[in-house]
Structure formats: C-alpha cells, structure tokens
Curated annotation (Swiss-Prot):
Keyword field contains Lyase: yes
GO biological process: menaquinone biosynthetic process
Cofactor(s) in the UniProt record: a divalent metal cation
Family: Belongs to the mandelate racemase/muconate lactonizing enzyme family. MenC type 1 subfamily.
Gene Ontology MF term list: magnesium ion binding; O-succinylbenzoate synthase activity
Source organism superkingdom: Bacteria
Organism: Aliivibrio salmonicida (strain LFI1238)
UniProt protein name: o-succinylbenzoate synthase
Primary enzyme class: lyase
HAMAP family per record: MenC_1
Pathway assigned in UniProt: Quinol/quinone metabolism; 1,4-dihydroxy-2-naphthoate biosynthesis; 1,4-dihydroxy-2-naphthoate from chorismate: step 4/7; Quinol/quinone metabolism; menaquinone biosynthesis
Catalytic activity: (1R,6R)-6-hydroxy-2-succinyl-cyclohexa-2,4-diene-1-carboxylate = 2-succinylbenzoate + H2O
UniProt key word Cell membrane: no
Gene: menC
C-alpha cells in the first residue's frame, strides 16, 4: 500500500550567504517521503529565493497535487509541475525504484566566497585535478580580473570556473578580461554567463578567447543545447531546471556535442546534495560537480555529507504538514 508524507524544514545559514539582493538567513524547503509498502524514498523541494520561478507556497500546492496523483496511480507528468517539485519528486521516485546508484562524486570545486588566502590553502591541500570556483560580478570587474589572475599565477596547475550570473555589461566584461593575462585565459574552464544577454556573452568569448558556459540560459524558454563557438559547458541546477529525466536529457545532449555538463547545487540541504553527488557520479563521471555549498549551512538534514562535521537535523524532528 502506498503512503506519503510531506515535511517542512527551516535550516539556519551561515551569516555570509548573500543571493543577488538579499542575505539568506535560513533555508526553507519541503521533503517528500514516498513508500510503496516495501521501500521508502525521499526527495527535497527547495525553491531558491530570487532564482526559482516559484515560491515555497506554490511548490507546496504543486507537491500535494502531484503526490495525490501518485497515490491514486494516475499517469504522472512530473515536468508539468514547477521545477523544484519536478526535481524533488522525480528524485524520490528514482530512489524508490532503486535506480539511483549509491556511489557519489563528492569531489568539489571549492567556492571562494571570502578570503582568497583561505582558498589558496585549500587548493594546495587538494590531490588530483585542482579546480576552484569564484563568484564574479558582485564587485568591480577590474578587481574580479585581478583576483582571477592572481590565483592562476600563484597556482600553476589550477583551473578556474567563474560565475557572473549575467552581471556585466559588455564594457564591464571587457574590463575583467583586460586584467587576466592572455597566457592564463585557457585555464579558465569557463565563465558562466558573463553578460546580460547570451549574444553579448558569445561576443565576449570571441573577443577574449575565454570559454563561457550557459547557466541561466539553460532555463530560458525554448533552450536547446547546440554547438556554439566559445561555449564549453552547460551548468545544470536541477532544483531550477526540473525533473531528473529532463536533467539527464540535457547532460546527454551536451556530451553528444563534446561539451561538459556540470551538475550544480541551488543551496539544497545535505539530503538533496548527496543525491546530486550520486547523480553526478552516474551521469557526469569525468566532471567535478558544482556542489561545494554544505559549508553555507549551520546544520545538515537527515543524510550526512562525507567528512562534514555540522550537526544533524533528523527528519523525525520536522513538522509533517501533509500525509496520506
């Protein structure tokens, strides 16, 4: 007999977590728990403020409706729901059917969100390929260029991933590039969405030789993966994109064109983050995923992230807001 529960969580965040225009003091989300009588599986639904098209209340309504359809054995169109619900519910179904491999890729590209000196220490301790991520576009473009150049100069075997979140005008993007030595530019794996408009980002790549990646563009209406000069990767954030099936389609399309596909976090709890690590190991085994976000939290949820010492919130401690 099928049963389902929906939990709601609030997890405290590190004080330094800033989204586009606001400080994120706590992460709010829902956990769906599905049981088929033999097995139980979970998925996380956590719209990200300022990035998701839906809010938590809209997600809750979609989730209850979809869960009722599942309990009634109706034919499900998971992607007809808002993206965070499509992702979390499809992940729970994948787990329930035992189709998500247990092995995870927990190697991360460390995120430089504070003192650059801290990142240098962290990178020097890394074995294997050294890849780091830096958020750019929040300060002056010239400063961002100088910081990127400094890392590439200090650590000769370092590759950088940069994320501008469409933050620059073409002029600002040019200022950034002017402060990155041409000899180091090939070690920028990609710069996510440097300019406000995709065509401006393509022009930037053509002019500078710096590879770019699509992130926000992946979620634009009618997006298709296609080979374009200068585009090295697509960044897939399942909470913002939709179902696991939809994400896998994007990965396969990118790989067919010789592009990287990077599974990336939308600041989910450790529960979903570990599932994303398993998805990454399964579908993008040769690419380091973008999952270095657990340290933005003050607490884990239900499932531990390897080597993380943050305290754990048990699912049994959460409020059940719906069950059947």
């Amino acid at each position: 007999m099928k049963t389902a529960k929906i939990y709601q969580y609030q997890l405290p965040m590190d004080s330094g977590v800033i989204l586009r225009d606001q400080r994120l003091q706590q992460r709010d989300g829902l956990i769906i728990e599905l049981s088929d009588g033999k097995h139980t599986a979970k998925g996380e639904i956590a719209p990200l403020p300022e990035f998701s098209q839906e809010n938590l209340e809209q997600a809750r309504e979609d989730l209850i409706s979809l869960t009722q359809a599942w309990l009634n054995d109706e034919v499900l169109d998971v992607d007809a729901n808002c993206p965070s619900v499509a992702f979390g519910f499809s992940m729970a179904l994948l787990e329930l059917e035992n189709n998500l491999p247990e092995v995870g890729n927990y190697q991360v590209a460390p995120l430089c969100s504070g003192d650059p000196d801290d990142l240098v220490v962290k990178l020097n301790e890394m074995s294997g390929k050294k890849v780091a991520k830096i958020k750019v576009g929040m300060y002056e473009a010239i400063r961002d260029g100088m910081v990127a150049n400094m890392f590439l100069e200090l650590i000769p075997d370092l590759s950088l991933r940069l994320d501008a979140n469409r933050g620059w005008t073409p002029k600002k993007a040019e200022q950034f590039a002017n402060y990155v030595s041409p000899q180091y530019r090939s070690r920028i794996e990609f710069l996510e969405e440097p300019c406000h408009r995709p065509e401006e980002s393509l022009e930037f790549s053509k002019a500078t030789g710096i590879a770019i990646a699509w992130d926000e563009t992946v979620r634009d209406e009618g997006f298709e993966v296609k080979a374009q000069d200068g585009v090295a990767a697509i960044v897939i954030k399942p909470t913002l994109v939709g179902s696991v099936g939809k994400c896998i389609e994007l990965v396969e399309q990118a790989h067919l064109l010789g592009m990287q596909a990077v599974i990336s976090s939308s600041i989910e709890s450790s529960l979903a983050l570990t599932q994303l690590a398993r998805l990454a190991a399964w579908k993008t085994p040769n690419t380091i995923p973008g999952l270095d976000t657990i340290d933005l939290f003050k607490m884990q949820l239900d499932t531990p992230w390897p080597h993380c010492e943050l305290p754990m919130q048990a699912l049994s401690d959460l409020e059940v807001i719906w069950e059947s």
